[in-house]
């Protein structure tokens, strides 16, 4: 039983690292696009859509992080 718990814990830790990386990636990309848009003199719809997309992805991955942390706490 302990063997399986250790495997599950390692898997969850690996997934948490992946989630945190994805959150960081989408946050930094969104920030770069926002800065680029602020420097532009005209409105770019594609850029606005990309910013919106990365904002939604940050929300989704933050929710996934919360769920995974809850599961990790329940398994301890």
Which residue ranges define each predicted feature?
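Short, charge/polar-rich alpha-helical segments
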Residues: 1-28
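Short, charge-rich amphipathic interface segments used for partner binding and complex assembly
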Residues: 31-74
């Amino acid at each position: 039983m302990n063997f399986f718990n250790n495997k599950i814990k390692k898997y969850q830790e690996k997934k948490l690292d992946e989630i945190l990386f994805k959150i960081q990636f989408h946050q930094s990309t969104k920030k770069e696009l926002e800065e680029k848009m602020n420097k532009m003199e005209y409105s770019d719809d594609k850029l606005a859509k990309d910013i919106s997309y990365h904002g939604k992805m940050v929300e989704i991955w933050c929710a996934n992080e919360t769920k995974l942390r809850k599961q990790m706490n329940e398994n301890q």
